[in-house]
Swiss-Prot record:
GO terms for biological process: actin filament depolymerization; actin filament fragmentation; actin filament severing; embryo development ending in birth or egg hatching; locomotion; positive regulation of actin filament polymerization; skeletal muscle thin filament assembly. InterPro entries: ADF-H, ADF-H/Gelsolin-like_dom_sf, ADF/Cofilin. Belongs to the actin-binding proteins ADF family. CDD domains: ADF_cofilin_like. GO terms for molecular function: actin filament binding. It holds the Pfam family Cofilin_ADF. GO terms for cellular component: actin cytoskeleton; cytoplasm; ribonucleoprotein complex; striated muscle thin filament. This is Actin-depolymerizing factor 2, isoform c. Residues 4-147 form the ADF-H domain. The keyword Metal-binding does not apply. PROSITE patterns: ADF_H. It comes from the Eukaryota. Depolymerizes growing actin filaments in muscle cells; required for the assembly of actin filaments into the functional contractile myofilament lattice of muscle.
């Protein structure tokens, strides 16, 4: 079911800077107050740690009463098969945060609008985290899930 919410062009521009040019560490998106467009709400500085992203999400979701989307550049360390030592890689993940105590209408609007954002930005192939509480964004568990679901 499509919601009719459009993706603002600033979302694509910000995502290109994150994904292709690595100028940001994360982008937090929200549906605007008129429920007509998905817009960029916050952009993280280039080398901002994952913990900063989580702290910003906590501030923006008003004690778990609001939903958000995010694209986050996550750094992971891997042991490559047949190689000595480890390698550090960056992977962009997509986060859909919809807490259980957000109003039902907001949760439904975010759920029905996510497809438009993913299609507009080309996010379909990204690893996705669906979070309903802040603990779902724990850095260690997100990285562990990312590594177990990706072929690197």
């Amino acid at each position: 079911m499509a919601s009719g919410v459009k993706v603002d062009p600033s979302c694509k521009n910000a995502y290109d800077l994150l994904h292709n040019k690595h100028q940001h560490s994360y982008i937090i998106f929200k549906i605007d107050k008129n429920d007509t467009a998905i817009v960029v709400e916050k952009v993280g500085e280039k080398n901002a740690p994952y913990a900063e992203f989580v702290e910003e999400m906590k501030k923006l979701v008003e004690d778990g009463k609001e939903c958000r989307y995010a694209a986050v550049d996550v750094e992971v360390t891997v042991q490559r098969q047949g190689a000595e030592g480890t390698s550090t890689l960056n992977k962009v993940i997509f986060v859909q945060y919809c807490p259980d105590n957000a109003p039902v209408r907001r949760r439904m609007l975010y759920a029905s609008s996510v497809r438009a954002l993913k299609a507009s930005l080309g996010l379909e192939s990204l690893f996705q985290v669906q979070a309903s509480e802040m603990s779902d964004l724990d850095e260690k568990s997100v990285k562990s899930d990312l590594m177990s679901n990706q072929r690197i």
